Structure formats: structure tokens, C-alpha cells
Amino acid sequence: MSEAAQTAQQGARPSERIPDAERRKHLRVRRISASRSAERTLGRAGGQRTLRERLALLEQAADVYDLDEAADMYGDGVVEALEDKVAGLLGKEAAAFFPTGTMAQQVALRCWAGRTGNPAVALHALAHPEMHERDAFSQVSRLRPVRVTSEPRLPTADEVRGLDEPFGALMLELPLRDAGFVLPSWEELTEVVEVAREREAVVHFDGARLWESTVHFDRPLNEIADLADSVYVSFYKSLDGYGGAAVAGPRTLVDELKAWRHRYGGTVFQQFPTALSALVGLERELPRLPDYVRHARVVAGALREGFAAAGVPWARVQPEEPHTNEFQLWLPYDADVVAEAAVRHAEETRTLLFSRPWAAPGPGLAVTEIDVRAAGLTWTAEDVRAAVAEFVDRLNKEISRWAAASG
């Protein structure tokens, strides 16, 4: 961030520099505070709620599970009930619960490597293990990532066919978050899976957000999951649970997963709050996801129209028509200035248009993620355009302050 942008957002003189870490921490606190006090928002995730609000989620638990049963111990009881529920939804023989997705996928791919005899995992350069897990595949589980492509889309059949070395597993992140929550077409997906089979590799889906992929594919969850040998799903992203994940697949694989789960420290004494919140999410949020996806497309179009009407040089929605209820928004401005404008706009209007951080993919560029949930369903296209106009007005003021500080 430039010195002027740092000082402009605080009203300080250019010589009074604020450390980046401190500035970002302060901005995050303000953004979360603005989210909690906002009267209107496109989506409010669990991580932005208070402890009291999060605990209230369990008030619905009696609707999905018998609360007079004994609490779970080391993976039985309500945890097993959740595993059975997930296996049924995905059309697999069994499923294993894990406290984190990072652990879940390492264990799954480690078990597949033991069966195939090949620790190489073919994946996208933007896949979650490559971007957000501190090289856990190689550092912890002795797996060897092999990057298929770095293009902002899923790997193609030709790219998988053309890999110049054997691999034991092909991991496909559906949707691919860091490319804009993108999905392939159904035909492209089936072709890639077929090529992996030709190369005698197993197919594993990183389906952290697979729940909201049914609209794009126009297929039910079990038909999508049927393409893969194993599928990982998350309970706290789309479903708004407290945390946790599961891997579904053949029963013999799942039995082995549970043995390795124990070795990795993932067989926790009691997990009933997390398991119950996941069951509530499957009951409450899962049926709503198609509506969120369809409305995200309305929001995306209105964002483009709003920025064009406000005189912004360009604004890009990635992908142009969202594949899920989440997508990226790109703007041609300094990311730190945009981030400050977004928080100030929310603080001043109590309308939270942008609930997530802004990143700088390059000089003079800003990108954020848009997440449309239940709260966003009440927004019309005109509501979105009006909020954009207000935001751009605040952004222009921030740019002026930036220019004054740099002068």
C-alpha cells in the first residue's frame, strides 16, 4: 500500500505511517463490526456473527436430532448420524467426519496413495491445498502435488491426458474458489474424469462448496458425486455450521480414513455442537442454496450496471454469470483505498455491500468475493444499483483524500 493511502484512511499526515499488519487488523475489526450492525447485507456468514447468535443455531437442533440421546464419544452417536446423512446425500457407501477439511483431504489422498502406490496428486495450481494449507500435502502427508494448469478454470481433458508423468489421484476442486468459484460444464467434467480413469488414477472431488453446484450442472448431488471415487464436503462454508468436514466413498476406504483420522488427532472426544450445527445446515440451508445461486446472477448483473452508470472505467464480475452463489468482483483501483471505502460506506449507511476483504492482484487493481445468502434475497436489482451508486460516491471521496495525502 502507498504511504498516501495509509495516511488518508486515518486522516493522518503522510509521515505518520501505520504498520500494514496493524492497519489490516483494525480494518478487519471495523468490517466485522459493520457487518453485525448492518441493516442490509447480501449475506452474513457465521464468522461475522456474535457468540450468542451462533449458539442460537442449536435451538433448531431438536428438529433434526433426538436431544435426549446420549452425547457422542469419539465419533459415535450424532457424529455417526451425520456421516450416514452425508453418505446418503452423496450416494456413497459411507462417510467419515473430520474436524477440518485440511485434515480430511490429506487423509483421503494419503489412503488413495497407499492403494495406488503413487503419491503424486494431479491438481490445479489454484487448488486450496496449494494456496491455503502451507504445503501440508508434502510437509505432513508425503504427497507430491503435480500442477495440471494455472489457468482460471478447471483442468481440461487434454491437459490431464498430456501430463508427462504418472499420478495416483486427480483432485478437482468444485467449484474452484480462487479462480472465481468456477465450475466446468457437465460434459467437460465427465471428459476429465474419463481421462483420469484411462490413466488409471482415482478421482477425488474437493467439494467444500459442492452443495451449491447443482444449479450449474443441472444434476442432483448424488449424480455429481458419482463421478468421483471420493468426495470431501465442508459443513461451515455453504451450510453455515460451526466447522467440520466429511469424506464420502467406498466403505473399505472410509474404514481406513477413520483409522488415519485417529492417527492425525482428529478423533475428538465430543463433537456434538459441530455435528448438530451441520445437521441443521443440511436441513435449513441446503434446500435454499439453489435460490441463492439464481439470485447471485441477478446481483452480478446489477453490480455491472451500477458501476457502469456510476462512471467507473470498468468493473468485472468473474465469472460473468456466476456458477454458484459466490463470485469475484474486480475494480480498477488501489485495493487498500477500495477496502477503506467499502467499510466507511457500510458504517455510514448501514448497508453492507461488500462483506469480505479486498485483495490486490496487481498495481491499481482490487478484487473481492461476493457471497449471496438468505439476506440477499430481499435485494432487487435496483437496490443493488442504488447501493453501488452510494459506494462509488464514497470511493471517490476516498480517492480524493488519497490524492490530498500524497500531495
Please report, for each region that a protein language model flagged, where it lies by residue.
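Conserved C-terminal alpha-helix-loop-beta "cap" of PLP-dependent enzymes
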Residues: 2, 11-25, 310-406
